[in-house]
Amino acid sequence: EAVAKESSFSDKKKTWKFKAQNVRDFGFSTSRKFIIDAMAVDLPTNKPLAISIYPKEANPLWGDLSTKAVAHTLKTYSHFTFDYPYPKAVSVSAEDQGMEYPMICWNYGRPDEKGFVSDRIKYGMLGVIIHEVGHNFFPMIVNSDERQWSWMDEGLNTFLEFLAESTFDPNFPSTRGPAKNIVPYMKGNQKYLEPIMSNSENIYNFGANAYGKPSTGLNILRETIMRREL
């Protein structure tokens, strides 16, 4: 149906009205090229829809994996924190970005022109979907200030992303979470290291300090200091 409508055109006007509760921002995406895929996610207190929206150029990668990744993220984050309260979570295919808003996010990752999907593209797409959908929890739902307290946004989210990646695929090549991955940053030039409480505009290496260091510390707390049962 989406492919058939791709070359169509209409000069008729149609008005869509959207309403959302308990959100602090919004995003919107539309195209006659979009394919829509969805599945319900059973949570103890809610049954949201995991939705993927993408053009045919994103297949077979998106049709096979995107909605599954969205649903898995909602289940995993809800298990470790609190039940996802919104009615839906939407993953939109974008050519080269990852960005989040309440209930919707844009994620990169597509096959090449011949339809080939490398492991780098596949796991990159899965990682960004899990991460951006996860931002619904931190900072959107808890409503923290990600510019002032980056570790409460990117750090907490990256820690939960690592848990979701590990349970989605035991061989997932996670870049942040395992302690060994933060070693090059921590033993590097010490004058460029910042406390995790630093304002996001005052961090020299934003990725390692706001994403990597907090998520690794939380993982060490879970695996070594307190152990998983606590």
Residue ranges and their predicted role:
Residues E1-I130, F159:
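Hydrophobic helix-coil surface modules that form long, contiguous segments used
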Residues T45-P48, C105, I130-F137, P184-S198:
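Active-site-adjacent bridging/hinge elements
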Residues E57-D64, D145-R147, E201-A208:
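Active-site rim elements
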Residues G63-V70, D119-G127, W149-E154, G207-P214, ...:
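Solvent-exposed, acidic/flexible segments
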Residues A69-L74, I129, V133, F137, ...:
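Alpha-helical packing segments of well-folded alpha/beta enzyme cores
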Residues D83-V92, D145-Q148, N171-S174, E229:
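Surface-exposed patches in mature extracellular/periplasmic domains of secreted proteins
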Residues E154-T216, T224:
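Acidic/His/Gly-enriched intrinsically disordered linker/tail segments
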